[in-house]
Amino acid sequence: ELNDQFLKAQSASGVEVVTGATHSSESFQNYAQQLIQAAQAGNTDTIEIDNGADLKDGTYKLEEKNYSNGYRVQFEMTVAGGKVTESNFDYIDKDGKSKQDDTEYNENMKAKSGTEPKTYIPTLNDEFVKAMGEEDGSPADVEVVTGATHSSHSFIMYAQQLVNAAEKGDTQTIEVDNIVTEK
């Protein structure tokens, strides 16, 4: 079912989580996204994932290449003592300003969806650090924030990539050539 959804959607984020197989679905989305990123870069090397390995101390970064609606994701995760100790996921504009500080954007989103970046972004970051502190914790344990579903799914998918990098100790910045469509 996951393979069929992926082929139809042509994107990892277009794959719906299968009821009763949440972690498997989230892993599928993560791996599919990594394969898409490799294909976009023309990289046909095998992607090795050391699933379940201890996290290596360091700072791990991921950033989107393209701006969508004036913002792109920058995500930094710190691992110390084998645990995620800090998560800094955010949407940044061309001037380096956070979407959390865009008053007009926050007001409009809150009116339409009931939440806003200055609320859901810190929630996602805090929930990730908390989830990863649990025995067998995983980015998939982060709850989707109502009203910020797309951002929550992107957060989880990107957090999984950072965890995969930390399992290997690969501190090279992950660059996502995110697809931006005109509206």
Predicted regions, residues:
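Active-site- and interface-proximal helix/loop "cap" or "latch" segments in soluble metabolic
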Residues: 1-54, 63-183
